[in-house]
Amino acid sequence: MESIILRRVRMILAIFIVIVTTASPLYAIDGNNRFFAYGVGQRSCQDYIKFREKRLESLEQQYERYTKDELYEIVDKIVEHWIAGFLTAHDLYVADTYNIAGNTSMNDIKARLETICRANGKQYFAEAVITLVQQLNPQRVKADTGK
């Protein structure tokens, strides 16, 4: 009799632990509140502002075969893809979120990131994107509408 009760208590406790751990928000940061960003996310907001202002002098010197407009288009696509990857990862790993950007266009996202970066040019670009995601959260699409 005692072993049946003990098994049930263990089962209930196991179910409770599974529910609690899966319902908790997931933060990919270490104990010191730090994280590692790849690619564009490692750049500073000052670099992003330079890019938005089409100040690509160092790239122009490094890649003379491209025009300034061609370089801007290349960098623009790299930045867009990095942002899209970040937002996709967010959608995958955050509960109750199907599409964090909702109806926000990529151009609007980039403009909002510029505003965030102008407020703190020394922060990493990844931090600016995190700030943007926090701003977008209230208007996120929570579930697939099936359209």
Predicted feature residues:
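N-terminal intrinsically disordered, low-complexity tails enriched in polar/charged
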Residues: I5-L6, I29-F35
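Individual transmembrane alpha-helices with interfacial aromatic-anchor signatures
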Residues: L113-C117
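C-terminal partner/receptor-binding element of secreted or periplasmic proteins
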Residues: R118-K147
